[in-house]
Amino acid sequence: MKIILWLCVFGLFLATLFPVSWQMPVESGLSSEDSASSESFASKIKRHSDGTFTSDLSKQMEEEAVRLFIEWLKNGGPSSGAPPPSG
């Protein structure tokens, strides 16, 4: 039983000597992939902010269309002869 314990301790010791980076060599400096991924990250942030703005604008336009439609209904709706608001 002591042999198994010592083998486990020795295995842990060896694991600390050979880290995971030993299996996959670390590239020195920035590669083109790194710079591309950083550009991609920046473009994703920009796209997200553009999408957020577009989403907010769409929501605001929908709310305005609903408000106009409700006003149209209050003012007589289809019986008034006026066409429904487009939007």
From Swiss-Prot:
What keywords appear on the UniProt entry?
A: Amidation, Cleavage on pair of basic residues, G-protein coupled receptor impairing toxin, Hypotensive agent, Secreted, Signal, Toxin
Molecular function terms from GO? hormone activity; toxin activity
UniProt lists the family membership as follows: Belongs to the glucagon family.
Q: Which residues carry this modification: Serine amide?
A: 86
Query: Any signal peptide, and if so, which residues?
Result: 1-21
Keyword Heme part of the UniProt annotation: no
One Pfam assignment? Hormone_2
Tell me what this protein is called.
Answer: Exendin-3
Record note on biotechnological use: [Lys(40)((68)Ga-DOTA)]exendin-3 is a promising tracer to visualize insulinomas (neuroendocrine tumors derived from pancreatic beta-cells in which GLP1R is expressed at >90%) with PET imaging.
Any one biological process term the GO annotation gives:
regulation of blood pressure
